[in-house]
Amino acid sequence: MSLTLRVLAPDKNVFDGIAEEVILPSTTGLLGILPGHISMVTAIDTGVLRVRTNGNWDSIALMGGFAEVESDEVTVLVNAAELASEINASDAESEFEQAKTEFGQLEGQENSTQKIKAKEMLNRARARVQATKSA
């Protein structure tokens, strides 16, 4: 048995294929999907989607969205996504370090718009780094 996985971003079709297993970064934690999974809809957090195809694991950095599981089909609609193989690991590491620095400089500004944006950039940078390390 297998799953059909589609990962769609506004600007591109990131992944469309057959998978043996999918691990989604939902807003309530990691969610494993196998063939025969119950139908559901869940919110997707910024993080790394893992997909097993032909016994091999691949990673996709996701930037928030929604996922639907229905009849062995998993459709993931996200704000943005990148295959780990398309991410330059050293660039991702530099962006992560820069995002950490910028976020740290905003300490004490708990509810400022600037700090919220910096936190979002930090989460995106972290997801890109994690995707390259788990590829």
Curated annotation (Swiss-Prot):
Pfam families: ATP-synt_DE_N (PF02823). GO terms for molecular function: ATP binding; proton-transporting ATP synthase activity, rotational mechanism. It is a peripheral membrane protein. Produces ATP from ADP in the presence of a proton gradient across the membrane. One of its GO terms (cellular component) is proton-transporting ATP synthase complex. Keywords: ATP synthesis, CF(1), Hydrogen ion transport, Ion transport, Membrane, Thylakoid, Transport. The lineage of its organism: Bacteria, Bacillati, Cyanobacteriota, Cyanophyceae, Synechococcales. F-type ATPases have 2 components, CF(1) - the catalytic core - and CF(0) - the membrane proton channel. CF(1) has five subunits: alpha(3), beta(3), gamma(1), delta(1), epsilon(1). CF(0) has three main subunits: a, b and c. Disulfide bonds: none annotated. The keyword Repressor does not apply. It is found in: Cellular thylakoid membrane. Belongs to the ATPase epsilon chain family. NCBIfam families: ATP_synt_epsi (TIGR01216). Gene3D superfamilies: F0F1 ATP synthase delta/epsilon subunit, N-terminal, Helix hairpin bin. This is ATP synthase epsilon chain. HAMAP family: ATP_synth_epsil_bac.
